[in-house]
Amino acid sequence: MKLEQCDTKKLTVMLDQLASAIEELLLTGLTTASDATVQTLNISFQEASRAGLLRLGSTLRVACEELTRYTKEHPDFSAKRFSFFLNRSWLLSKGLSKAIKESDREEFERLTWNAPVTPVRQLEVVTLGVSKKYVPNAFCAFEFRMRRVEPAGVEAAASVANGGVEESGARGTTDVAGNTGTAGGGILPGQKLIWSVVFPVKPNQNLPPESFLHLPQKQKFIAYCLIEGRRVTFGDAFVAFEKSGTGRISLGDKSTVMQGDEYTDWSKFISWSPEAAIDRLNAYEPGPLDLEIELQEEVFIEDWEMLPEPLRETESHIVYPLSYRGGRIDAVVSRGLDGATMRAALDKAVAQKKKPVVFGLMHYEKCRLTLQPLSFMGKKGPEYATLSRDKVDRVALLKALNL
């Protein structure tokens, strides 16, 4: 995001109010924190996300989560985690406000951590996995990890022309959808893509997290259509490429989302190169605001086994020790409601003689390889193990939301 693209007046007011709210909370102490305090930070989180301030938004999300735990006297509340992310939120809000007031474009872009946005006329994708974060009385967030695919007719024709062997496109070309690839990252077949959505959760609104996926979006689609194993076409959308090379999709008022045919060629995506990950780590230059998860990358883990040791528990996660390629990976699953479905799926996978391929997000924490599993790859495609498949009563959902 560029500074000139922002509503600087509105953004400055929001950032200054956020900084003041944090300062007031620190001056008066946590004992004065209430549901209203949680709502203030939660509204700031939603506004930051809508404004495209991804780094501030993700930081506020964690601070809101811990503050909610404190006000509800939840045993998993972590004072260390809360103070870290609250302090980080204050630093980012003050820094961004200062950059806006001084018209410092370079500093603004560094703190927002956003890449330039590219308009895309048409983009056909499939979903490999979904991460879910649910904080009662605050929000429910989903992040869909996808790959770009060729339209069905073109994909079949290309396969026949190449003797049944797919040929990867080169960067700097124009693809069949009319999207021009550039040296900075063309939107070509196989490109990693993300689309995320956040839903506010009202106090005492006891709904299954997955029920929010059935709510209509502004573009007249429901997010559930992304997890039915079918092609989905985004029209008149926007893509911003992160430093990792992953593209983040955003939608405008004129954007469209259409579900297509069932997708079957899932096995083509199952690959991961540890060597490439090592190269990225060697080229990485750390900064004072960086987090471990900002170095995360999508991985496929094959031929893994459970190590013969008990599960380990932290403040917020259950840790499954896995053996992979002679090394160790810690697979972490939330202890909360948002991790219940994955815990059941992972327990089932551990018990199987032939372990399924795991798709997930890996980052490096305290010299450990840490994996957040998202799905298991089967013959018919991914099993979205983070999401419950229980039937949603749409009438009850709309009634609960007063829609």
What are these regions (language model features)?
Residues 1-403:
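Helix-loop junction hotspots and adjacent acidic micro-motifs that serve as functional foci
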